[in-house]
Amino acid sequence: MSKGKLIKGIAGFYYVEVNKEVYECKGRGILRKKKLTPLVGDYVEITVTDEDNKKGMIDDIFPRKTELIRPTVANVDQVIVVFSVTQPDPHLSLLDHFLILAETQNIDVVICLNKLDLVQREDVAELVGIYEKVGYPVILTSQNDSIGLEQLEKVLRGKTTVFAGPSGVGKSTLLNRILPHVTLQTGELSSKIARGKHTTRHVELISLETEGWVVDTPGFSSLNIDFLKEEELADYFIDFEPFAKDCRFLSCVHLNEPICGVKTALKAGQLVQSRYNSYLQMIGEIKKNRRY
């Protein structure tokens, strides 16, 4: 038996890399009995059934440290959330949705702001400052003149990384620059509606020369957070945490309660209004979904 990493799954076939060799595998019936479904990113134990043709069977799945639902990927170390600084303009509420979802999975986040060549650096300074103050690393990139690509490559080394973000922001183009040995399909950006066409067909791990892995995922127009309760949401806004301890009530959801540390910090300029606006929007989504 050999231990490998599942890098792709299509139509019941699982492609597992073992010592730089890729084996086409099927899952044994015991996995179904255990109600285990192999996921891209899983570490698995396989038996090689045909070395010449690189065929095998998956015997077992090792415990997962993380599991994303959308995209469905296991054992992710970090999420790089890619947004463009223009064309399309960054949607801060959507960005915050990505951040909250990553926080609920306890996965590290790096924010990548792409298409820097289309604006002046000082034009994005405020946006960068907002999220660096919250505590998220921010990388500025441009695939057209290689700005930030070396910094991005360093962040990827030795880790399994999900690239996420809305369509049209340049995820696949960035990856094509970082991974010259792989060509990912890119879509045209519709100038009429400033929203890219979905081009990624399936989830796949791509090997890095620096002993890491990346996943290119479909762009998202929304993220579902209805699994959270109203009183839980603020726990994942990491910039709220220092001020929430000053709330009178432990159950404070930072809306209309008296003596709310978060609202006080907001009025004092210690919290950013756009982040609180995102919080209010998400609270509204959770309340709406609870009614149905």
Curated annotation (Swiss-Prot):
The record lists Zn(2+) as bound by: 247, 252, 254, 260
Q: Does the keyword Zinc apply?
A: yes
State its location(s): Cytoplasm
Keywords for this entry?
A: Cytoplasm, GTP-binding, Hydrolase, Metal-binding, Nucleotide-binding, Ribosome biogenesis, RNA-binding, rRNA-binding, Zinc
Q: Which cofactor does it need?
A: Zn(2+)
Report the residue ranges that make up the CP-type G domain in this protein.
Answer: 65-223
Principal localisation: cytoplasm
Domain of life according to the entry: Bacteria
Q: Name one GO molecular function term.
A: rRNA binding
List this protein's GO terms for biological process.
ribosomal small subunit biogenesis
Q: Top EC class per UniProt?
A: hydrolase
Entry's EC annotation: 3.6.1.-
Task: Offer a single GO CC term for the protein.
Answer: cytoplasm
Q: Which InterPro entries does the UniProt record give?
A: G_CP_dom, NA-bd_OB-fold, P-loop_NTPase, Ribosome_biogen_GTPase_RsgA, RsgA_GTPase_dom, RsgA_N
Binding residues annotated for GTP, in chain numbering: 114-117, 165-173
Quaternary structure? Answer: Monomer. Associates with 30S ribosomal subunit, binds 16S rRNA.
As for family, the record states: Belongs to the TRAFAC class YlqF/YawG GTPase family. RsgA subfamily.
Task of the protein:
One of several proteins that assist in the late maturation steps of the functional core of the 30S ribosomal subunit. Helps release RbfA from mature subunits. May play a role in the assembly of ribosomal proteins into the subunit. Circularly permuted GTPase that catalyzes slow GTP hydrolysis, GTPase activity is stimulated by the 30S ribosomal subunit.
Provide the protein name.
Answer: Small ribosomal subunit biogenesis GTPase RsgA
